[in-house]
Swiss-Prot record:
HAMAP family named in the record: Leu_tRNA_synth_B
Renumbered ranges of motif 'HIGH' region: 106-117
A GO CC term assigned to this protein in UniProt: cytosol
UniProtKB keywords: Aminoacyl-tRNA synthetase, ATP-binding, Cytoplasm, Ligase, Nucleotide-binding, Protein biosynthesis
Protein name: Leucine--tRNA ligase
Lineage summary: Bacteria, Bacillati, Actinomycetota, Actinomycetes, Frankiales
A single MF term (Gene Ontology): aminoacyl-tRNA deacylase activity
Amino acid sequence: MARAMSETAEPGARTGAADTTVAPTGASGGIIPAAAGTAGGAPAGTGSVEPSFRYDARLAADIERRWQRRWADEGTFNSPNPVGPLSTGFEKVAGREPFYIMDMFPYPSGSGLHVGHPLGYIGTDVFARYLRMSGRHVLHPFGYDSFGLPAEQYAINTGQHPRDTTNANIANMRRQLSRLGLGHDTRREIATTDVGYYRWTQWIFQQIFNSWYDPQAGRARPIAELIEEFAAGTRAPVAGPAGGNTAVSVDAVRAANPAGLAWTELDEVSRRKVVNAHRLAYISEQLVNWCPGLGTVLANEEVTADGRSDIGNYPVFRRPLKQWILRITAYAERLISDLDLVDWPDSIKQMQRNWISPSEGASVEFTVVAPGEEAGASDPSGSSTARRIEVYTTRPDTLAGATFLVLAPEHPLADALIADTWPADTPVSWRFPAGRPGGGTEPADTAGPEAGADPAWTPRAAVDAYREFAAHRSDRQRGEEVIDRTGVFTGSYVRNPVGGGVIPVFLADYVLLGYGTGAIMAVPAHDSRDFSFARAFDLPIPAVLEPDADWYAAHGVVPATPSAQWPEAFSGAGEYRPGPASAPVLVGLSKSEAIKATVHWLEEIGAGRSARSYRLRDWLFSRQRYWGEPFPIVFDVDGLPHAVPDELLPIELPEMTDFRPTAMAEDDASDPVPPLARVADWVTVTLDLGDGPKQYRRETNTMPQWAGSCWYYLRYLDPTNTERFVDPTVERYWMARPGAVPGDGGVDLYVGGVEHAVLHLLYARFWHKVLYDLGHVSTKEPFKRLFNQGYIQADAFTDARGMYVPAAEVTATPDGRFLFQGAPVNRRSGKMGKSLKNSVSPDEMYDRFGADTLRVYEMAMGPLDADRPWHTDDIVGSHRFLQRLWRTVVDETTGAAAVVDEPLDDEALRVLHRTILTVTAEYAGLRFNTAVARLIELTNFVSKSYGKSPTPRALAEPLTLMAAPLAPHIAEELWSRLGHEESVSTVAFPIGDPALAAESVRTIPVQVNGKVRFTIEVPDGSAEQTVRDLLAAHPEFARQTDGRTIKKIIVVPGRIVNIAISPA
């Protein structure tokens, strides 16, 4: 029978007992007695005397320092590999099942950590510790994402070199995380800025550069195999289906081989250009946000809505620049379908699908009409060598209504389409801006030079002026719905394959180069943007679909109204109108039938094909900054790229004292000058790439911050390997899962914020799939399970200007107001961070309460995947729990263990095993908040049941073991004081017995007016109220008392229930 606590005893106080076990001095020697007035003790000045060994901040700090030192000295959390330099001790864990846990590694900020950062790190550490104690061989590494613009900008702002600031920031973050007691294998720590790390980032880029995607094989293949197929004549060096490959840069192939010659007929430079257009890493002109005032290209997020830089408010221009691009779109289908292989939140999977966003349609080719043939008839398909413009459309069934083509102003084919002179009868309004420099408002009808247009205002001049105009507008502005559309006629026409009529080609900024092919067929009757453009430029608006009567009525027009007079485009479903003679017959067909019929017709005449397009664009991969991985690429005299030999890796960043971007005048039209371009003796290099020593020019752009984070999970596996980026045996051991389907596996648990739901995860999956195709990794996906932790929120305060003020300096008044420096401020809740000035340092929490208290509090605040508010005052509750846990084992006066070797009674056994079973399930399910709650309940049970008496060892030990994942330092100390020498991390987690956890039940008869009518089952020893509650819930009780008045219910606990009711 559990002993009840004495009414006069302090709850949980221990004063020593004759049957206690004293802790050994080896592991716990050097304890510093607690001082009065520290956290958890009596406030100074109250007259109370603190027990010498009370668990407070000072004692916690001593315990934490000693155990962290022991963990480091003994390599407690080292996870041996099966082979290689990190394999020492593998024979001890060879029979265990491996489990790989990872956190999304942090950027080492100059401001260090706040208490919101470690939330996920604590969660993964709790889970990793639980799994180790459950018999798994756990790998839990950590590292730093240390390249990139934030680190460079911080260095510029502080006047230091980014290498120095990065190393200092990493050291500070490592110190803060070390104090938290995270059980990482520190031998595997990496930083993406380590030369030994980015040497392999460069190597992986080379694998991508030296590969191409074969749609027939459905995978990447070495570029050497493509060259062999070209040379053998089994594959044609042309773009599109004729070349057997759609995953190419079509325009680049056509530019390199415009006549469609055979491989043997091409010169060496043309051959290399064709090959380069097939590579998974290629160079292409891309529209970027160029800010001369800052001397750099900006991300879309760094540009304001009015087209200026977020920093400095400088003008930003949209202009094409040659950039490195990775052909991620080749993997679009696999990136979608392979989401079925991973255990990720459905919301994250959907975000990735939406980002890729496939659409079904057709690729239609419009043949450019030679000058003077605008009015002539022609074969709609054109000739095989004629210039063509490829357009992707989801509505090929509306081709008959296409009355003009629109290209993005930056489209690579635009220059070739610009005529020398305006065709006869070109309207002045088509000649931006209205026919002459300085603008004008000439009417939209035909007007030649004699009507006032400047004869020197050629198509080239008009296009140049329009491009300058469009360069000042952001993608957001260009995509907005506006009534007045802008554009310029190129002077060229194309032939519509449906009907064979010729239609003009415009450049307009509402078409973006980054979407589709950068060219659209405009069907103004059925698209609102095309409709407004056609109205502005007086272009035909023929209808393909007939609106229903309701649409006409809603718009106040009669059905006979010509479509050119409609008030707006009709974008709904309607019946097909009869089309041209040389067109597929669509009348009477459904939309899907009409699309299918049109695509089949286009394929038959050679003017188009079925196609699938994606919102996903190829990945712009270069940055005009210093602090990033140098590309392992050099350029020859022809400007063509070459990968440097493996033996020359790494290509290290040169030392620079001034690494700032080159700022220019606001209106400077020059290309950006990357910082590396200023290091002349580094840029120019003499190499022998197999044909004798020659002079080459290094690539002076650097890789984006994403590069290092695309593969770090693989380097953790084998971080000291200088021969390979990862040993295949090591990779298979940690990533592949024996017995699973081929290619299944990946990191067993990857934890991080939802803000990385798309880009980081998508880019890492892309790199991994390339490596898988090339045989370098064994799994199809990098991360098997993904878990998104929530955020810690905190109060933030803004002043009258709306500016955030330091939350730590805000005071509250008795009437509920908040003041900063005497002035009122407004309170709001937001994600804890530097920008809201509401950060709380973990160092402060360590010093006030200890690391274990912070760990328990963050896990107890709520579900790991939920946001939760931070309140420093509430952390005291977690500290008091640990104090009670300490007192279940330790006598606060002597510091000795206060436990007794005696068997547990039935109640204690039941409570213990019920707790073990529940806590085991909660740990396994990452429900750490409820695990904390159950441990608190068990601790309270021990305190209440045993009071001043020693705790049975059979309770103290499993309680300590269950608390170990959450509060490892105090658990290690308690385990040591219980007489054990081994680390608690190496001890098996308690196993609950369902039979012992089950409550014994008793069947009690229920009498109604003196006769037994039914029975109820109640837990043995139930209180009277429990019996009454179970009685009221029993269905027979309702039936027996229905329509009766209950006069009295008499409960004899454990024996019988009597109910007196009125007669029926």
